[in-house]
């Protein structure tokens, strides 16, 4: 919640985006929508490689945006307001929720096998921090088979990198070679 300290001079109608580091909101979408109070970016989630899409996890309820005057705290926005609620249940939790469809990208586990292992071993999700899932051979095998690491039957689909991806990736594609299938 230290984010609030950085917002000391923000105006009440300023927009504040709260997002995980691996979630990238598509700011172009804001040109076509007027945020009244708060909204959620429905994002596509890619795992292990930039172009391995987890279709079964769409829409990923990723980045959140709120007018400063309605922001109680970043944690409130993360956990209380948009706590992985099924999209048809939002009306029970919010008045006039807004959704930003195709609202960006969540690039999860886009790192080396060793760093994936370290991430799993450092996880707050203790149920996933077991030898089977953090084993380098298992990680490599699952990625090659285009399957989620955690034996949940999620299949990852290879997609072409095209103009629906972030501009930075398109402009710097050569930097991402090892992270493209």
PLM features per residue range, with description:
Residues 1-6, 14-16, 43, 140-144, ...:
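Extended interaction regions within the primary functional domain
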Residues 1-18, 27, 177-180:
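Active-site-proximal specificity loops/subdomain of glycosyltransferases
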Residues 23-129:
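Conserved catalytic core of nucleotide-sugar-dependent glycosyltransferases
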Residues 95, 99-181:
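C-terminal accessory extensions appended to soluble enzyme cores
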């Amino acid at each position: 919640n230290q984010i609030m300290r950085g917002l000391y001079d923000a105006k009440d109608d300023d927009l504040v985006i709260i997002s995980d580091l691996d979630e990238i909101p598509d700011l172009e979408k804001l040109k076509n929508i007027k945020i009244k109070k708060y909204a959620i970016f429905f994002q596509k989630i890619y795992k292990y490689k930039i172009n391995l899409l987890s279709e079964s996890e769409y829409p990923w309820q990723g980045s959140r945006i709120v007018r400063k005057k309605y922001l109680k705290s970043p944690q409130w926005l993360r956990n209380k307001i948009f706590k992985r609620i099924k999209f048809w249940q939002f009306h029970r939790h919010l008045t006039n929720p807004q959704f930003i469809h195709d609202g960006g990208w969540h690039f999860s586990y886009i790192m080396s096998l060793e760093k994936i292992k370290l991430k799993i071993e450092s996880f707050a999700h203790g149920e996933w921090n077991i030898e089977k899932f953090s084993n380098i051979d298992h990680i490599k095998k699952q990625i090659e088979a285009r399957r989620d690491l955690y034996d949940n039957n999620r299949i990852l689909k290879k997609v072409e990198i095209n103009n629906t991806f972030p501009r930075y990736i398109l402009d710097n594609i050569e930097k991402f070679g090892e992270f493209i299938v």
